[in-house]
Structure formats: structure tokens, C-alpha cells
């Protein structure tokens, strides 16, 4: 998993 995708997922959840 790329950091960009992970960040997007975290932002989407939050």
C-alpha cells in the first residue's frame, strides 16, 4: 500500500 493511498483512506475515514 502506498502512503498516498493510505493517507486518502485515513482522510476519507476521518
UniProtKB/Swiss-Prot annotation:
Expressed by the venom gland. It is found in: Secreted. One of its GO terms (biological process) is chemotaxis. It comes from the Eukaryota. The modification Leucine amide is found at residue 14. GO terms for cellular component: extracellular region. GO terms for molecular function: toxin activity. Keywords: Amidation, Chemotaxis, G-protein coupled receptor impairing toxin, Mast cell degranulation, Secreted, Toxin. Belongs to the MCD family. Crabrolin subfamily. Mast cell degranulating peptide. Induces the chemotaxis of neutrophils. Its mast cell degranulation activity may be related to the activation of G-protein coupled receptors in mast cells as well as interaction with other proteins located in cell endosomal membranes in the mast cells. This is Histamine-releasing peptide 2. It comes from Vespa orientalis.
Amino acid at each position: 500500500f502506498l502512503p498516498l493511498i493510505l493517507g486518502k483512506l485515513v482522510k476519507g475515514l476521518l
